[in-house]
Amino acid sequence: AHNKSIDDLISKYKIGGLIFFQGGPVRQASLTNRYQSQSKVPLFIGIDAEWGLSMRLDSTYRYPWNMTLGAVQDMSLIEKMGKQMGQQSKRMGIHFNFAPVVDINTNPKNPIIGNRSFGEDKFNVAERAVALMKGFQSEGLFATAKHFPGHGDTSTDSHHTLPVVKFDKKRIDDVELYPYKELIKNGLSSIMVAHLDIPSLESRKGYPTSISYNVVTEILQNDLGFKGLIFTDALNMK
């Protein structure tokens, strides 16, 4: 029944892509082939593989979490890891990895980022994110930096509520946006925008960054000069 509902989305609504959340590699590859054969325009296939395909698929390789990579001093090892993840993803027909996470983990009470972050230092985060991105993209896997403009210093989970970030624009530009600037300079393919309430960037009360013209168009595209693909975080988040 679930597979049929996806068939209908492809045939009736001409969706542009799919994201896989569970299953094994054989089933995932089979479903990808099924859906691609039904779509008149090739579908983009994405996955959250922050520490490898095993984040979502069983019987696949698992790599260290970003917190561990934050202590690795040899960037070539991180790039090599990204390259392997790229090879494995391409074999599965996956185009986008919704990674790396470039949130700077400056709030120890953060319930959702934590060990998914490279750490609390913006230079450390940016250097490792660039290495991982280069590894992905050397194999033709598009990297997607997230969660723009920065989910690191929040004390609530945006899957369940709308977190508020109270920093002023200068602090956000100096700290949270730093990794994005470095990744964009190095050829980043795509960015995922978070659902956040940031009064210093969006004056409308309770208006999420994911649909904010000022955040997405003025800051990300105009100020940072980003020309790649822009995703929002999941729309089924509360």
Enumerate the language-model features and the residues they cover.
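Short, acidic/polar
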Residues: 2-12, 77-88, 173-180
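Second-shell residues forming the walls of enzyme active-site clefts
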Residues: 18, 26-38, 43, 53-55, ...
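Active-site-adjacent structural elements in enzyme catalytic domains
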Residues: 25-42, 73-93
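Short, conserved phosphate-binding/catalytic loop or strand-edge motifs used
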Residues: 102-112
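A short aromatic-anchored loop/beta-hairpin motif
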Residues: 11-22
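A charged helix-plus-loop insertion that forms the helical arch/lid used to bind
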Residues: 63-73, 117-119
